[in-house]
């Protein structure tokens, strides 16, 4: 509902942004790693205001050279990612958001389209906005997302439960596509 006030929907006051960057540990043919890094370095980010959570040495090294702060190096998980890895990373970034260390959380990864096409993606995970949901519905189809739902619990407690699960699922999906 439009009247819900929750930190996951509002964002923080801190201009710093956490970016979970998924690349490989080794150089691959083509621009696999470089294209993800370009999304960040040539995007609308102030590189000095970024906290990078790196999954993959290539992205970590390139962003470190560009002057970004590497908050966490998770390069060991990019070869065989598990849901537990995604959950640990998600909790770490959510804690940073909850403590006001960052005002937004982003995910940068390479989406597997087919064996020839891999598309770099940059998605804002938090704060969640109505525009983000509308765009996702437009891109992927509604699949019932626009149905009115009635919940027994308070909306805020539902958000407190669902949004971290959504975020961890997005991180895990990115890990699987990038692996």
Residue ranges: model-predicted function:
Residues 1-179:
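C-terminal beta-strand-loop-alpha-helix "lid" module of Rossmann-like NAD(P)-dependent dehydrogenases
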